[in-house]
Structure formats: structure tokens, C-alpha cells
Amino acid sequence: MMRVLIVTAVFTFFLVLTSSGHDEDNEQRNILEGMFLDRAIETPKGLEEKRACGILHDNCVYVPAQNPCCRGLQCRYGKCLVQVGR
């Protein structure tokens, strides 16, 4: 509940700053946008993190002696698929 109130207050403050048309205010708005807007929009944790290996049906490029797919999977037909014989 407290998090919602903080996000609402920051968003309201951001709207007040963006409503004015002065050049100095535009500079302040750009700074605040970089600081607060990213925090107000929540994304699932780790969404943008790159995985070390491909999961089932991820795209992959086959390179001999390297397996870009996670354990138990292999790169076939440009996708990470279950290993043959499993």
C-alpha cells in the first residue's frame, strides 16, 4: 500500500513538472524522468537479464563443440529441443 502511495506521489510530481513550458523546466523534467520514471514502472525481476543457456524452444545457432542450450537440450532446426534419446 505504501509503495502505491509513493509511486502515485512521484507520478503527480512528475506531471506537475511536465505541464510547464519553460526551457529550465524541460531540463529538470528530463533529469527527473531519468530518475523516477524507471522506478515507477515495475518490471518482473530478471526479465532483462540474459540467460546463460537457452531454454526449450529458444532460438539458437548450432556451433560444433558448443551447446548454447541448457542441460538436457540440444540445438536442432534453429531451436533448443529435447536431446535425442531422452
Swiss-Prot record:
Cellular localization per UniProt: Secreted
GO MF assignments = toxin activity
Summarize tissue expression. Expressed by the venom gland.
Record carries keyword Secreted: yes
Name a single GO cellular component. Answer: extracellular region
Q: Which UniProt keywords apply?
A: Amidation, Cleavage on pair of basic residues, Disulfide bond, Knottin, Secreted, Signal, Toxin
Q: Where is it chiefly localized? A: secreted
Q: Which positions carry Valine amide?
A: 84
Which residues are the propeptide, according to the record? 22-49
Residues in the signal sequence: 1-21
Q: List the disulfide bonds.
A: 53-70, 60-75, 69-80
The function of this protein is: Possesses strong antiplasmodial activity against the intra-erythrocyte stage of P.falciparum in vitro. IC(50) for inhibiting P.falciparum growth is 1.59 uM. Interacts with infected and healthy erythrocytes. Does not lyse erythrocytes, is not cytotoxic to nucleated mammalian cells, and does not inhibit neuromuscular function. Has neither antibacterial nor antifungal activity.
UniProt comment concerning the protein's domains: The presence of a 'disulfide through disulfide knot' structurally defines this protein as a knottin.
Task: Family membership, please give it.
Answer: Belongs to the neurotoxin 10 (Hwtx-1) family.
Record-given protein name: U1-theraphotoxin-Pc1a
